[in-house]
Regions:
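A short glycine-rich, His/Asp/Glu-containing loop-to-beta-strand
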Residues: 1-17, 23
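Double-stranded beta-helix
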Residues: 3, 61-97
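Conserved GNAT-family N-acetyltransferase fold
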Residues: 7, 27, 52
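Short, charged/polar surface micro-motifs in flexible loops or helix N-caps
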Residues: 9-13, 33-34, 80
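A generic "binding-loop/recognition-motif" signal
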Residues: 13, 22-23, 42, 58, ...
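Short beta-strand His + acidic residue motifs that chelate non-heme Fe in jelly-roll/DSBH
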Residues: 16-17, 36-37, 44, 59-65
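Glycine- and acidic-residue-biased ligand/ion/polar-headgroup-sensing regions
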Residues: 22-34, 39-40
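Short acidic-glycine-tyrosine-enriched beta hairpin
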Residues: 40-57
Length: 97
């Protein structure tokens, strides 16, 4: 069994860095505008129709832009370990990209 969840973020809301240790995650963006970023890599701006594949063991975060809600289907294999929050400096800097 692989769980599928519909996740909605209010404008300006993001999750913390996290890792999926035993499997990966697929995000199917269904609405709004958001961000996805793997640690040490540039952030990716997301909109409806985008697909993100995160492989197991990759530290990452995702969530809404400051001015839009964001919604995706999350297909996640294995448990998630949530880590430190994304800093305001990192998140605020994305709006200038």
């Amino acid at each position: 069994r692989v769980p599928v969840g519909l996740v909605t973020f209010a404008p300006g809301t993001i999750n913390a860095y996290h890792i999926h240790h035993k499997g990966g995650q697929i995000l199917l963006v269904t609405g709004g505008r958001g961000w996805y970023q793997e640690e040490g890599k540039p952030a990716r701006r997301l909109r409806a129709g985008d697909v993100v594949v995160t492989h197991k063991g990759i530290k990452h975060w995702h969530g809404a832009t400051k001015d839009s809600w964001f919604e995706h289907l999350a297909i996640t294999s294995g448990n998630s370990e949530f880590l430190e929050p994304v800093t305001d400096e990192v998140y605020e800097g994305l709006e200038n990209q």
